[in-house]
Amino acid sequence: MQRRTVTEKLAPMILLRFLVASSLLALSTSCSSGGLSHLDSSLVHNGRPTEAEAYSDFLIARFAAMTNDPQKAAEHYALAIDSAPEKSGIADRALFASLLSGDYREGVRVAKRANTLGSEAALVRLTLAVEALRVGREDDAKQMLEQSRFGPFNRMIARGLSAWRVVDIQGTDAAVRYLEDGLSGDPRLDSATLYMMGLIEMSAGNDDAALSVFDTLWDSSARLAVGVEAHAQLLASRGQRDRALEILNTFDQQVGHNASIARLSQAIASGDKIKVRRLTPDEGAALAIYVPAAALMSQTSDDVSAVYFGLALALDPELHVARSLWAQSLSNAERWDEAIGVLARVPETSAFYATSRGQIAWALQRSGRSQSALAVAAEALDHSPDRGLQIQIADLYRAVGRQEQAEALLTEIIRDDASHKREDWRLFYARGVSRGELGDWPEGERDLLKALALQPDDASLLNYVGYSYVDRGEHLDFAMDMIRRAAEMEPNEGYIIDSLGWAHYRLGDYETATQHLERAVELEPGDPVLNDHLGDAYWQTGRKLEARFQWRRSLTLDPADGERDRIEAKLVAGPNVPLVKQAETGAGAQLPKPVRP
């Protein structure tokens, strides 16, 4: 039986992963000269209407966009603009493709053309507003931001940009009133606006007002890295170092590693003098774009957020966290070399340099260049002891099957954490998996139970520990309880529903297994493992024709090395997966209390 790789299962430990859906367009044309002379042929080609050329460019651009080539899409959309019907619509597409390909200057040129053609698209107006702010044309920026119709997401960005424009022209008080007038009453939208309000107060030196805003947001459980960093800076600069460290450590535990947060935490802990960063209007405006875009990226599986990261960087080229997320968006779209190019522009002086090197290593690995990835990883580790980078590289080692190196590096991180009185459940989870892969189940089990004690409510962890026990025939009631709870927490997560079904299968309850495995395949129809498991369940319930269909389908989905022969053998003789029963267990690790609330 093939299970998920550690990299796929440990969502909290790896870089943010997204799938970009793409369609394929088959376009075939054929023509024959039919014996035309050179003159006849020339007349035919010269007589081709300009509109036909435009539609040709439009189709090429559409195909390029569908097949994830925004640079070619932008080029051919631009060629189609002047002569095609519905010109402004094509110009809008050309702008999106230009920004998606990272060509801001071309994007501005196309946005101007689209505006001339009468486009009222939000992205056109935002692009022109950003350019006007960048070059100091305040009146043009005001017109684009205040005389345009925006949906909720773009309206939030437009109001943030306008607020920083107001700071520059009318002062802080006017900007704060402007933001207050735009509050929606929805905490999900207003928290970003309130953080922006605090940053504006801080930029003007109104630190008491800024702290009041930040304290209120923190107590409401709002967590925004740039705002939390500013909050901690203010506290530390006033001598409240313990409170600042408490906030930064809580952010790390609840949200995860952030390079800027980690650097600030280290500086405060080392007793360094903390300098409060006062944002310029351009830097603030860049954050007004970046913050909603980062939130969008965490909630969607498309590449729209990448367009906004490019706009933010046009205003503040030093906003390296935007480069990091932009590159991640490119990697999600399998545009590996472009992602590496974006990351290569992060300088060594940046807090995100180490993170960027880890991302480069991952991009190389995912594009099939594992040796280059390992070389970059080794170089990065030699250059920096950054904890976030170490975690990225440990993940990389697991992905390429170097479990011993992964285990050693994770042990080093855990040991260093202990010296700072910190325990991160994700690290014990990862090391437990690596130790299990290395055949050291007792130590792996100890790590996994430690992770459970620290974090009893993570669906991925509950699923992994529960399935591991089922697979070994140990603590079966406890194991099934964990898997069921994971499935209740994540009912639309295919691999968790698969685990629930496969656990029932291993225990001989084939009818229940079939129900869950069918649901898992509905959720993840392109997964070879899930289709393979469903085939086994069908076979055991007498549905042998359907079983063979699922196994054949699994073979078309690129199963892992070694799995193809096993699946092909089942097409001849059926499955041979042994049932499990409660195994004899020794003293072993102490199980935690029942996981049911």
List where the protein language model places each region.
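Sec-dependent signal peptide recognition
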Residues: I14-A21
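N-terminal secretory signal peptides that target proteins for export/translocation
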Residues: M1-I14
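Bacterial signal peptide processing site
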Residues: S32-G35
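Hydrophobic residues within membrane-embedded alpha helices
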Residues: T5-V6, V20, D316, G473
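Alpha-solenoid helical repeat scaffolds
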Residues: S41-M66, K72-P597
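Positively charged, low-complexity intrinsically disordered regions
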Residues: R3-T5, F18, A232, R553
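C-terminal motif of bacterial Sec signal peptides marking the signal peptidase cleavage site
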Residues: S28-S30
